[in-house]
Amino acid sequence: MAEGIVFDADAVSKDIAEGIAAIQQASTMEELKAIKAKYAGANSAMTRASKAIGSLAKNEKKEAGKVMGKLRADFGRAYGTKEASVKAAQEAAELAAETVDMTLPIRRKPLGARHPLPKLMEDVEDFFVGMGWQISDGPEVETEWFDFDALNFGPDHPARQMQDTFYVKGNQSKDAAGFVGSNMVLRTQTSSDQVRGLISHGVPLYIACPGRVFRTDELDATHTPVFHQVEALAVDKNLTMADLKGVLDKLAVAMFGPEAKSRLRPSYFPFTEPSAELDLWFPDKKGGPGWIEWGGCGMVNPNVLRSAGIDPDIYTGFAFGVGVERTLLLRHDINDMHDLVEGDVRFSEQFVMGE
C-alpha cells in the first residue's frame, strides 16, 4: 500500500455492515434515503475508500477493488430489496385506506323534486297520446276572433269585457277570414287552439290542447290570474254524448284511480250544445267519497264547426275541458292555490322524483 494512504478494508466492511443492518430496520422511504446518503453518499466511508484505491500501489489496487466491489454490491442488494418491500407496504396501506367498505350503510343523497303541475300536465298528455289523440299547442297571445268569435261568443258576451279578459294594447291582427282589426288578447281558454286545429288539419280530428290561460282573477285560495287548462276536441262522423261520457270516465280513472267516475249535469256554454257540467266522484275526496265539480263539456255547437268550414250536417263532435290546478288540488288534497304559484321549494319536496 502506498505511503500515507489509509485503506482499511476491515473498517469499510464494518461500516457497510452497520449500513445494511440499518437498512433492515428502516420502515419508510425517507429512512432508507437517509441511510443511503450516510453509507453510500459523497461523504461516506465507502466513497472515501473507493477514491483511496487510486493512490494504492499497483499490486494492491486489484485486491482493494475486489473488496470494494463486493461491499458496494452487498449494500446495493440489501437496499434494493428493502426499497421494494417498503414501497409494496406503502402501496398496500394506501390501497387499504382507499378501499370502500361495502358493508357500510350508504349516505343517501336527497332526491330531486319537480313541481307537480308540469308533471300532472305530462300525465294528462300521456293519457290522450295513449288513446291515439294528437297534442296541440297554440299561441298564448291570441286573436279575439279565435278566442271568442269562432267559439260562438256574441259581441256583447260578458267574457269579452276588460274586467274578465286581458287585452294586448295596440296590437291588431288578421282573423281567420282575413279581415284586419281583430284585437289581440291573452287567451282565456285553450279552446281557441281547437278551432286552429280544425282549420289546419280538417276532420276527422282528435286533439288535446293543454296550456296556460289568463283571466283577470285575483289570486286567492281557489283562483289565480294565470292557470292551466287541458281542453279536448273530437270531431268525426256519428259522435254522440255517449262517446263523450266514455272518454270522461276513462280520464277520471286515469287521474283519480279505478273507483273514480264521472257524471254530467245540464248547463250552458256558447261553444257546445247541449252542454254539461262535469262532476267527479272519487273515494279520496276531502270530507269523504262524493261528487265535486271538475270541468265543463258538451257536443260542439254547429256554429263552431261552421267557423272552421266544417259541415255540421255531416260531422259532429264533443269537447271538454278541465283545470289542471283544480285537478291537482283534488288529487293531492291541496288547500290553497298559493302553494302552487309561490315557488316554495318545501312544497315541491313533497313530490320527489319517482313518486
Swiss-Prot record:
It is an enzyme of class 6 (ligase). Keywords: Aminoacyl-tRNA synthetase, ATP-binding, Cytoplasm, Ligase, Magnesium, Metal-binding, Nucleotide-binding, Protein biosynthesis. Binds 2 magnesium ions per tetramer. It catalyses: tRNA(Phe) + L-phenylalanine + ATP = L-phenylalanyl-tRNA(Phe) + AMP + diphosphate + H(+). Signal peptide: none annotated. PANTHER family: PHENYLALANINE--TRNA LIGASE, MITOCHONDRIAL, PHENYLALANYL-TRNA SYNTHETASE. It comes from Bifidobacterium animalis subsp. lactis (strain AD011). Its cofactor is Mg(2+). This is Phenylalanine--tRNA ligase alpha subunit. One of its GO terms (biological process) is phenylalanyl-tRNA aminoacylation. Its main location: cytoplasm. Belongs to the class-II aminoacyl-tRNA synthetase family. Phe-tRNA synthetase alpha subunit type 1 subfamily.
